[in-house]
Regions:
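Helical "lid/coupling" subdomains associated with nucleotide-phosphate turnover
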Residues: 1-180
Length: 180
């Protein structure tokens, strides 16, 4: 199968090549670019299945799952930026943490609309920040106080209950297939 970062990369490429439309539909072979048709088989429901190998392939359900994740991330970012009167282009840096931040190709995430279009040099991967913080707290008592102070400054926002998030989520479900 495909890992999450591999799925993002593959969908970004297939969007660019015209194998996936704005709605997330994996095109059947007869509608796909001619040079890629040998990788696509019909699924019996009007969609295509893109085969990398006989055992590794991309289905409509895979693309839909990614669209939901993409819409949640992009919608959340939009709401948080809007609440603070910011736009993505004004950010000095964006830090990505955890497995997501460690393995994702930011250019692919921007290509599918999961992350806002910003300069790649402004994106930083921080790795496993939870483990790093727990390790610091276990080793250094002074760090525990520093981390506690940092945690007290954090604000929890339940996005799922916000109308503005629901609207942003819906806006981000589709892929932008317009060329620059």
């Amino acid at each position: 199968g495909l890992c999450g970062s591999g799925l993002i990369d593959l969908v970004a490429v297939l969007l660019c090549l015209g194998c996936i439309d704005a709605g997330g539909r994996l095109l059947p072979p007869e509608l796909a670019p001619e040079d890629l048709r040998r990788h696509i088989r019909p699924d019996g429901q009007g969609n295509g299945v893109f085969y990398l190998t006989e055992k590794v392939y991309l289905t409509a359900a895979d693309v839909r799952s990614l669209q939901l994740a993409k819409a949640a991330v992009a919608g959340g970012i939009e709401v948080l930026l809007r609440r603070h009167g910011l736009s993505a282009c004004r950010l000095d840096r964006v830090c990505l943490a955890g497995g997501f931040g460690n393995y994702i190709d930011p250019k692919s995430a921007m290509a599918i609309g999961m992350l806002p279009e910003i300069l790649p040099q402004r994106l930083f991967s921080l790795g496993n920040t939870s483990l790093a913080g727990a390790s610091m707290a276990a080793i250094d008592p002074n760090k525990r106080c520093e981390l506690r102070s940092c945690a007290e400054k954090c604000q929890y926002i339940e996005l799922s209950g916000l109308r503005e998030f629901t609207e942003a989520f819906t806006d981000h479900i589709t892929f932008d297939t317009t060329e620059d």
